[in-house]
A protein has these predicted regions:
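C-terminal helical/coil "lid" or tail adjacent to the Rossmann-like core of SAM-dependent
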Residues: 80-137
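Short proline/glycine-enriched turn/loop segments at secondary-structure junctions
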Residues: 138-142
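Short amphipathic alpha-helical patches
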Residues: 63, 67-68, 96-100, 121-126, ...
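Core SAM-dependent methyltransferase catalytic element
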Residues: 76-79, 99-107, 144-154
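A short His-aromatic
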Residues: 1-5
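Conserved catalytic/acceptor-binding region of the Class I
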Residues: 7-93, 109, 113
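Alpha-helix N-cap and coil->helix boundary residues
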Residues: 35, 52-53, 119-123, 143-144
């Protein structure tokens, strides 16, 4: 998702892999299945008017296109390529846990949010709180997510 040249990165992984070795990667799929990202990034983008990324630029959903990484693995020289969607749940328990994780750990979010002044940060937090608590009104913040696992052999 974040390598500038994904094919070059895959070829390097294959180069250092022992014959018969196996490699697996995980990438995020469509935003609609990853509310844990879109809840906060949507609020940041709406409020800070960030420019849209260039098509194909490194980013969270860059690899969401069906078959993209499998094709890169094939072009890098891997065989027996397999991919599978793996749903998950991010068990944050509380909104504060979710907020802290997103604003302290998630690199792209930390960078974007860090550029906001205190008033803007509070506005974004209120919007995200409203969005998250609307989706999970019982207070149990167990946020759906989904990834694609792609596997190949040398």
């Amino acid at each position: 998702m974040f390598f500038p040249d994904m094919l070059l990165a895959a070829k390097e992984m294959v180069r250092v892999l022992k014959p018969g070795g196996k490699i697996a990667v995980s990438v995020r799929i469509v935003p609609e299945k990853n509310f844990w990202v879109t809840a906060i990034m949507g609020a940041i983008n709406r409020n800070m008017e960030l420019p849209a990324p260039q098509p194909g630029a490194p980013g969270m959903f860059r690899c969401a296109q069906e078959g993209l990484i499998a094709d890169i693995f094939f072009r890098a020289g891997l065989k027996n390529i397999y991919q599978e969607e793996v749903p998950g749940i991010l068990n944050c328990k509380t909104f504060d846990n979710y907020w802290d994780m997103q604003t302290e750990v998630a690199g792209p979010i930390v960078a974007s949010h860090g550029n906001a002044d205190e008033l803007m940060k509070e506005k974004i937090k209120r919007e995200v709180y409203q969005s998250v608590t609307q989706k999970y009104p019982d207070g149990a913040i167990n946020i759906d997510s989904s990834a694609l696992i792609i596997y190949g052999e040398k």
